[in-house]
């Protein structure tokens, strides 16, 4: 089983499977995956009009059986039209076969209101979650998909404190109803009294419990006949791949899955031992990052598409061959690789040579800008921070993560209480850190965690299911070329490959922090869902 060590920003770093370290996996994502903070709600930012407009209708919190729910009604202007919707925020009780409570899942569901009688067969529903493990759905919820979003400045960074909540004209609600799911010990979700939270911590356990939530929701809200989609980010894509087969085995066939900043095969991102694959697959993202910071030579800066294609080809040919030679690569052959790798990363030949041709992401983040004090982000390498320890090997923090966590937590807490009318004194766990450890892989002795074969089986058994992969060019957590590699190694037939959509965006792991990418992601998802819907009779 692979073990993993948490990075400072919470993203998982897997190493070779070691029987003595089996149950020490993933201390969260990101993203995302992404040190938990139990932050109190901050006031929403004043504006010329209320940051949160009054709802058209409100209801007091209701209790249905063991479920605590708050149902409110709202409207938003998108694409020049008024979209009315119902929001349900609350907890759903999950019980065992004996009727004993096991957990209370917090969720927020959005349903478009059309004024007509509701026909579930005509309205798709998408179940959305983030990753970690240990991340609540707030990142996608208030960053990309929900009808409200956290206000960002022109650089894609939170404006506060205090933080503002604004309308999101790029909400996915115009294309699909949505259910945002917080797994146990994230958000407001908790294990029931007397139940150990550890019972939910693991690859298989997580798939089973989130899958059971989805089944219960479909039943309780009469959505079995709706076209059904999943959307996951970061480790959430690992979960989504597992769910693709789990749900199918339980009579739930999906129309499509949206994978955002995906990691399905952990061998593609996990440096360690003799695994050279990540060094090959991270390289194009290094080049994209160096280009963004204008560190590449003039020739490479002329045409990014041409440069990226050139680097990708070199990575899987000359570079891969050179790494495969190991210590036998010497003399002029080694010198040629050092020179090319230095050119494509903008690092010095001396650094490349001393790194033995293998540049770890953390080292690249530290060295790219030249002095060790200015560092680039891991989740988005466009962003720059100042490291207080310039001589250390790894960055002290991730500027593309630390700027966001308090903002998302406080904004979501205020949104849940003030707008969705869900009352809870629990801290909203945007990123639960050690609260989901240890994370069981449940696959002892089987090498790196790899759920790509699981997804491939589901695609063969459900050949109408479509999949979409979305990646950012400057993501140094789940690099885009690793996703390309995984897709091309799923052994899909030509017909099934037609069901795969591949999308690229400016930005990093949370590419939706870039306004243009947020708009493009919205359009791409709407088109994807429309194409995956059954043909009208």
Where are the regions a protein language model picked out?
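Alpha/beta-hydrolase fold catalytic core
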Residues: 325-477
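Catalytic histidine-centered segment of alpha/beta-hydrolase-like enzymes
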Residues: 506-517
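N-terminal cap/lid segment of alpha/beta-hydrolase-fold proteins
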Residues: 64-116
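A catalytic-pocket lid/entrance helix-loop region that shapes and gates access to the active site
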Residues: 147-151, 247-343
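Short alpha-helix in the alpha/beta-hydrolase fold that links the catalytic acid
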Residues: 465, 479-489
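Alpha/beta-hydrolase fold nucleophile elbow
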Residues: 222-235
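Alpha/beta-hydrolase active-site loop
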Residues: 173-176, 183, 200-218
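N-terminal cap/lid subdomain of alpha/beta-hydrolase-fold enzymes
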Residues: 42, 47-59, 99-199, 488
């Amino acid at each position: 089983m692979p073990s993993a060590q948490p990075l400072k920003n919470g993203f998982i770093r897997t190493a070779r499977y070691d029987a003595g370290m089996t149950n020490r996996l993933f201390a969260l994502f990101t993203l995302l995956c992404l040190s938990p903070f139990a932050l109190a709600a901050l006031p929403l930012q004043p504006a010329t009009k209320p940051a949160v407009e009054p709802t058209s209708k409100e209801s007091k919190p209701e209790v249905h059986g063991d479920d605590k729910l708050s149902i409110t009604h709202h409207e938003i202007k998108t694409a020049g039209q008024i979209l009315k919707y119902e929001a349900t925020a609350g907890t759903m009780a999950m019980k065992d076969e004996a009727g004993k409570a096991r957990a209370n899942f917090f969720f927020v569901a959005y349903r478009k209101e059309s004024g007509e009688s509701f026909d579930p067969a005509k309205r798709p529903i998408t179940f959305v979650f983030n990753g970690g493990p240990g991340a609540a759905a707030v990142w996608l919820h208030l960053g990309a998909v929900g009808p409200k979003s956290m206000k960002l400045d022109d650089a894609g960074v939170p404006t506060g404190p205090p933080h503002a909540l604004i309308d999101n004209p790029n909400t996915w609600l115009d294309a699909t109803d949505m259910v945002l799911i917080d797994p146990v010990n994230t958000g407001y979700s908790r294990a029931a009294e007397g139940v150990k939270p550890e019972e939910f911590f693991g690859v298989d356990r997580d798939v089973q419990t989130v899958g059971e939530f989805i089944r219960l929701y479909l039943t309780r809200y009469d959505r079995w006949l709706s076209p059904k989609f999943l959307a996951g980010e970061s480790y959430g894509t690992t979960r989504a791949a597992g769910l693709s087969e789990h749900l199918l085995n339980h009579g739930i066939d999906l129309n499509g899955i949206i994978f955002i900043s995906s990691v399905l095969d952990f061998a593609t991102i996990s440096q360690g031992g003799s695994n050279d694959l990540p060094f090959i697959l991270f390289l194009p993202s290094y080049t994209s990052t160096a280009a963004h910071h204008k560190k590449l030579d003039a020739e490479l800066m002329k045409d990014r598409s041409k440069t990226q294609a050139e680097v990708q080809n070199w990575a899987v040919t000359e570079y891969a061959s050179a790494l495969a030679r190991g210590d036998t690569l010497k003399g002029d052959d080694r010198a040629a690789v050092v020179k090319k790798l230095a050119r494509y990363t903008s690092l010095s030949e001396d650094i490349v040579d001393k790194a033995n041709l293998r540049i770890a992401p953390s080292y690249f983040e530290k060295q790219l800008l030249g002095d060790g004090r200015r560092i680039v982000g891991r989740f988005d390498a466009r962003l720059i921070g100042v490291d207080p320890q310039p001589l250390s090997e790894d960055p002290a923090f991730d500027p593309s993560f630390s700027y966001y966590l308090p903002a998302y937590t406080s904004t979501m807490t205020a949104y849940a209480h003030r707008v969705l009318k869900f009352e809870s004194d629990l801290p909203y766990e945007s990123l639960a850190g050690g609260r989901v450890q240890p994370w069981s892989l449940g696959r002892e002795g089987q090498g790196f965690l790899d759920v790509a074969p699981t997804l491939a089986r589901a695609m063969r058994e459900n050949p109408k299911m479509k999949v979409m992969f979305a990646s950012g060019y400057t993501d140094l957590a789940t690099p885009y070329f690793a996703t390309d590699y995984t897709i091309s190694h799923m052994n899909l037939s030509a017909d099934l490959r037609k069901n795969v959509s591949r999308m690229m965006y400016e930005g990093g792991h949370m590419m939706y922090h870039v306004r243009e990418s947020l708009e493009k992601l919205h359009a791409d998802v709407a088109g994807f869902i429309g194409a995956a819907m059954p043909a009208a009779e």
